[in-house]
From Swiss-Prot:
Protein name: Probable dual-specificity RNA methyltransferase RlmN
Keywords: 4Fe-4S, Cytoplasm, Disulfide bond, Iron, Iron-sulfur, Metal-binding, Methyltransferase, rRNA processing, S-adenosyl-L-methionine, Transferase, tRNA processing
Any one Gene Ontology molecular-function term assigned to this protein's record: rRNA binding
Radical SAM core domain segment(s): 100-323
Disulfide bonding pattern of the chain: 107-334
Family recorded in the similarity comment: Belongs to the radical SAM superfamily. RlmN family.
Annotated [4Fe-4S] cluster binding sites: 114, 118, 121
Protein's cellular compartments: Cytoplasm
């Protein structure tokens, strides 16, 4: 794979940027390079419609990629987790999820670490280094496609808070959706936030084609403040108004994600609070039984506990689903990312 020890990589550029950066006279040459990158080549040598001399010059002067796979793990359920080393030696993690219908979803990271400090999340416990560049985001998707073939969806639910890195995420999305490249439909892309209202408004005002998910977890203000410190500066009332605004601007329903923890947010009172929060919203509820994280004292709810909670919500007319456990044995399930990064990075 063509990698050099600096952060500027062609994978994070549009065709016109490649043309300018590489000093190419012909626009179509840049488009050819852009298409090759999206096709998953590992080096300039594989770009067979470029002359040998051009490939040699490009190889000597430029870098296709700025990241490489440090570690690859595969769960028996088909989940793949990659630890990806960045140009500066930092490590992030990205996951491939395959559902029962064989749809493949890339769960990508947008930051090295995470500053949000959610109490139930591994990534929130390991600290924060920096935002990722568009190339570092795009390359996660490309690495996963090389491992597993063509992917169907992208969710920004890996390491980091997407609303703190929207410019680079937006660029990465537009690169992957570019008609002369990967041409991925934006409707197959979801951005998940812990509840940073400013970012939700910013997304809404762009007239988003992508989907929004919000990690709600609980609609009890006091409990949510303890579990998710973001609540202290972005209250539940403010969050609900931001979601309503997104509904109105996008004509899309928002997914509310609830990480369920045994004896903490799964009783009838917790359900009633979620039902009340959801009133007036175009939303879908995704229940996520908590995945064990070493060093954290939360517990996974029993199946009976989850089913009872489901019933409360369904009786209120809410549309819900419960996420299947995938990737637990390799630390690749929701809330578990960061084990390799914690060993490798200096937070």
């Amino acid at each position: 794979m063509t990698i050099k020890k600096y952060k500027t990589a062609l994978s994070g550029m549009f065709p016109e940027e490649i043309q300018s950066f590489c000093g190419l006279k012909e626009k179509f040459r840049a488009q050819q390079i852009f298409h090759w990158i999206a096709s998953g080549v590992n080096s300039f040598d594989e770009m067979t419609n470029l002359s040998f001399d051009m490939r040699s010059k490009l190889k000597n002067d430029f870098s296709l990629f700025s990241t490489k796979i440090k570690e690859a793990l595969k769960d028996k359920d088909g989940t793949i987790k990659l630890a990806v080393e960045l140009y500066d030696g930092s490590v992030i993690e990205t996951v491939l999820l395959t559902d029962k219908a064989k749809r493949k979803t890339a769960c990508v990271s947008c930051q090295a670490g995470c500053p949000m400090k959610c109490a139930f999340c591994k990534t929130g416990q390991i600290g924060f280094l920096r935002n990722l560049s568009a190339s570092e985001i795009v390359e996660q998707f490309l690495h996963l496609e090389r491992e597993a073939g063509s992917l169907d969806n992208i969710v920004f639910m890996g390491m980091g808070e997407p609303m703190l890195n929207l410019p680079e995420i937006d660029k990465a999305i537009n690169i992957l959706a570019h008609p002369k490249g990967r041409n991925l439909s934006k409707r197959r892309i979801t951005i998940s936030t812990s509840g940073l209202c400013k970012g939700i408004y910013e997304m809404a005002d762009k007239g988003p084609e992508v989907r929004l998910a919000v990690s709600l977890t609980t609609a009890d203000e006091t409990l949510r403040s303890e579990l998710m410190p973001i609540t202290k500066t972005n209250s539940l009332d403010e969050l609900k108004q931001a979601i309503k605004y997104f509904n109105s601007k996008s004509n899309k329903r928002v997914t509310l994600e609830l990480a369920l923890m045994k004896g903490l947010n799964t009783d009838k009172k917790a359900a009633q609070e979620v039902i009340e929060f959801a009133k007036g919203l175009e939303c879908f509820i995704n229940l996520i039984p908590w995945n064990p994280v070493e060093g954290l004292n939360f517990k996974t709810p029993s199946e009976t506990e989850v089913r009872t909670f489901e019933t409360y919500l369904k009786k209120a007319g809410l549309n819900i689903s419960t996420r299947q456990k995938r990737g637990q044995s390799i630390g690749g399930a929701c809330g578990q990312l960061g084990s390799t990064a914690a060993r490798s990075n200096r937070f």
